[in-house]
Amino acid sequence: MAKKSMIAKQKRTPKFKVQEYTRCERCGRPHSVYRKFKLCRICFRELAYKGQIPGVKKASW
């Protein structure tokens, strides 16, 4: 989990647009966030296995 101070800092609008970055909306993780789902890879995997993300299923071939 991310620190509360870092999550609060990320919510503020930065002075320059290039300073914006994505964070997972569920846990606050700053790395490996899928923009389409706004989730990090770990949260995405957990929710996908539970079937809570519509249209996503485990690949099998």
From Swiss-Prot:
Transmembrane segments: none
Domain of life: Bacteria
Annotated Pfam families: Ribosomal_S14
Gene3D superfamilies, alphabetized: 30s Ribosomal Protein S14, Chain N
One GO term describing the cellular component: small ribosomal subunit
GO molecular function terms attached to this record: rRNA binding; structural constituent of ribosome; zinc ion binding
GO biological process assignments: translation
InterPro entries, sorted: Ribosomal_uS14, Ribosomal_uS14_bact, Ribosomal_uS14_CS, Ribosomal_uS14_sf
Keywords, alphabetical: Metal-binding, Ribonucleoprotein, Ribosomal protein, RNA-binding, rRNA-binding, Zinc
Record note on quaternary structure: Part of the 30S ribosomal subunit. Contacts proteins S3 and S10.
Protein family: Belongs to the universal ribosomal protein uS14 family. Zinc-binding uS14 subfamily.
Role, per record: Binds 16S rRNA, required for the assembly of 30S particles and may also be responsible for determining the conformation of the 16S rRNA at the A site.
Official protein name in the record: Small ribosomal subunit protein uS14
Organism for this UniProt entry: Bacillus cereus (strain ATCC 14579 / DSM 31 / CCUG 7414 / JCM 2152 / NBRC 15305 / NCIMB 9373 / NCTC 2599 / NRRL B-3711)
Gene that encodes the chain: rpsZ
